[in-house]
């Protein structure tokens, strides 16, 4: 199996989209989902950009993720058309869009494809000096991630040692 050809990388939220752009530049199949039009501008004319209408960040309210997914049918339809065998979700757990959407999107993919896809998550941890609410979001997001069945692998990135400009 050729890894690049059989992998779809999905960036959720600003951090996830920035990292996913690096993979797009290397020729991987990618999708980007964020509610902030300003954040999406840094992606330029990449293919697979999904503006989550009505959700310019979740303002720390991660529970809005399911509502967001239901309100953005274009994104869910794109998730239902993924041909690649491996799906990698990249997102920051300290924010709200990526951390809120991560478990919901992973579960949605699992519900659509069952065991036919390999789901891998790549959560980016906040820096030590970030606000306490970012660490609270991280804890909640990781708890949700741990409760999901069907995630084949998780690779944590330390934001302290991984700067993406």
Where are these regions (language model features)?
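Tubulin/FtsZ superfamily GTPase core signature
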Residues: 1-165
């Amino acid at each position: 199996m050729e890894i690049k050809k059989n992998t779809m990388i999905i960036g959720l939220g600003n951090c996830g989209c920035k990292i996913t752009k690096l993979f797009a530049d290397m020729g991987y199949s990618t999708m980007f989902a964020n509610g902030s039009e300003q954040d999406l501008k840094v992606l330029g004319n990449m293919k697979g950009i999904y503006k989550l209408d009505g959700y310019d960040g979740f303002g720390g309210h991660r529970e809005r993720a399911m509502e967001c997914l239901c309100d953005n049918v274009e994104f869910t339809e794109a998730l239902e058309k993924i041909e690649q065998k491996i799906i990698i979700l990249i997102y920051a757990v300290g924010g709200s869009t990526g951390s809120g959407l991560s478990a919901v999107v992973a579960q949605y993919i699992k519900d659509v494809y069952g065991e036919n896809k390999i789901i891998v998550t790549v959560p980016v941890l906040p820096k030590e000096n970030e606000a306490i609410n970012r660490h609270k979001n991280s804890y909640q997001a990781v708890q949700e991630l741990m409760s999901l069945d069907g995630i084949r692998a998780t690779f944590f990135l330390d934001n302290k040692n991984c700067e993406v400009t």
